Amino acid sequence: MEDVGQNPLDDVKNIFFASSLEAVKQNLDCLNSDLEKDLQKLDMENQVLLRKIKEKEETISSLERKLALSLEEAKEEEELNYVIDEQEESLRELELETAKLEKSNAILSRNVVEVQKKISGLFTNIGLEEETTKQILEEMKARLQKSTESCAKQEEELAKIESDYQSVSDLCKDQVYYIKKYQEVLRKMKEEKETLLLEKQISKAQDDSSQTVKPGSILADTTQRNMERTTIKKQERRCWYKYFQYLTFMVLVFIRLLAYVIFHLQYINPDLLVDVLPLVLSRGTLESLRKVSHPFLTLAVEEALPH
């Protein structure tokens, strides 16, 4: 049963771990794509800036050549001054653009740092999730083991209750058999009583008729009376024997009923007397019964307590 309980737990663990890894992989792919896009933008801007710088250098070189050629003329000087001003303006613009690029580079570096922090946080979260899943699996294994132990205990108790129920049903069958036998014995006893009464009436009638009989028939009457007395004694012995059988049968039935009551109070419903006595007895009798049984039910532990 432990192998059957561990397989679904391992499957749940693998599914949970695979789903978490897929989510982390998707997050990493998104972050990598964002980084690549930002780096591409940065490269494009750097290339544009380099082209502009080259163009400006070319213009500066051309202007320098023009300045070298037009040093003699004032107009050329004015133009040169004008060109210088333009060059200064272009240099300012270049400085502004370089400052913007530096700001964008700083922003990109901050974004890269944040992405690295997020990636490290994701890995730490994955480690924490693995620890939590391990703890959950251990708790589930412990609960499963406890449930299997409780199921085994319940099965043992169920088997015990079934055996007790079988014994109780056997007792009930025996009681039904004995009750039938008791009814048959009572029927036979009634029949024998009726026969005894009839024989007594016949003997009385014979005694009454014997008073009018001749003296020669006295011997026959005495023998007949002796025979009747012996039969009556035999019937009395049979009655006493049947009474004894009936008494033993009742004792056995009482013992079986007492055993059934003890079994019921011990295993099925120990609070039967507590539930039934208030319904059967009155309050006064219950109080008197409580007063009588209280000294026997309490434990005398005063001598065992420390002073």
Curated annotation (Swiss-Prot):
Disulfide bonds: none annotated. InterPro entries: SMCO2/5. The chain crosses the membrane at residues 243-265. PANTHER family: TRANSMEMBRANE AND COILED-COIL DOMAIN-CONTAINING PROTEIN 5B (PTHR22422:SF1), TRANSMEMBRANE AND COILED-COIL DOMAIN-CONTAINING PROTEIN 5B-RELATED (PTHR22422). It is a single-pass membrane protein. GO terms for cellular component: membrane. It comes from the Eukaryota. This is Transmembrane and coiled-coil domain-containing protein 5B. Belongs to the TMCO5 family. Pfam families: TMCO5 (PF14992). Keywords: Coiled coil, Membrane, Transmembrane, Transmembrane helix. It is found in: Membrane. Residues 17-207 form a coiled coil.
